[in-house]
Regions:
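Signature of N-terminal electron-transfer/Fe-S-associated modules in redox systems
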Residues: 1-152
Length: 152
């Protein structure tokens, strides 16, 4: 079945089943591998993308639900000019990543949080972070606060 997805400003016509999880369409059909598979049950957050500006766990969203909506992945978060999003820049400045596996989901969740709450509290940040097996939560928190000061 034909499904049309608008990802990072580009339209993709795909011949896939409508119940395919968006995660696999992004990774396997479109080739955007920045969004990671972690758990497959929308619990860990590694697969977080924005759908019409809202953070969503792409492993549990059927492509039929995402069709016709604006989807942004980690690859599309930076500006068209290549300038990093303030959250991405803060991630680098605070030396957040270790293994990096959860990072795209963490960054996407943080960008959505800052859009909704420009000056988040520590409790706000704790409410949106993903599972990080490396335990970089203190650096993640610092990076989100840093990004907030640069008006993400």
């Amino acid at each position: 079945m034909a499904v049309t997805l608008k990802v990072n400003g580009k339209t993709h016509a795909l011949d896939i089943e409508p119940d395919m999880p968006l995660l696999w369409a992004l990774r396997d059909e479109i080739g955007l591998t920045g969004t990671k598979f972690g758990c497959g049950i929308a619990q860990c957050g590694a697969c977080t993308v924005h759908i019409d500006g809202q953070p969503m766990r792409s492993c549990s969203v059927p492509v039929s639900t995402a069709a016709g909506k604006n989807i942004t992945t980690i690859e599309g978060l930076a500006g068209a000019d290549g300038k990093l999003h303030p959250v991405q820049a803060a991630w680098i400045a605070e030396d957040v990543p270790q293994c990096g596996y959860c990072q795209s989901g963490q960054i996407m969740a943080a960008a959505a949080l800052l859009k909704e709450k420009p000056n988040p509290t520590d409790a706000d940040i704790s409410g949106i972070t993903n599972i990080c097996r490396c335990g970089t939560y203190i650096r993640i928190r610092r990076a989100i606060h840093r990004a907030a000061t640069t008006k993400a």
